[in-house]
Amino acid sequence: MGDAVLVAIANVLAANLRDGDVLARWGGEEFLALMPYCPLEAACATAERIRAAIAQAPLDVGQAPIALTMSFGVTQVRSTEDLHTAIARADKALYQSKNAGRDQVSVA
């Protein structure tokens, strides 16, 4: 069932990203979306739209529908940093969301 949930989530994520955005599984239950040339405000709005879509529609993965929540960490790569540093900041923001009760978007 776990793989079916990941596939269902990935489908919601992909449906809300733009052509040219990159979606990857990052760790066990995390995803990473790279959104080139996307202003921070638009990236936050996309994360919020995905969060709401997951929260409002229980996923049907073959058994009883499963209610899920998603937490997000959003950041923008600064001109003075590499991608790894930006990802680390997004990860910190993700854990801010999780520690603040989950099911929210935090910005780094």
Identify the function of each model-found stretch.
Residues M1-V22, E30, P36, I54:
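Active-site-proximal alpha-helical element of nucleotidyl cyclase-like catalytic domains
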Residues G2, G27-G28, G62-Q63, G101-R102:
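A short glycine-centered flexible hinge/capping loop motif at secondary-structure junctions
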Residues A10-N11, A42-P58, R89:
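Alpha-helical scaffold within the catalytic cores of cyclic-nucleotide enzymes
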Residues M35-P39, A55, V77-R78:
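Residue-level recognition of strand-loop junctions within catalytic nucleotide-signaling folds
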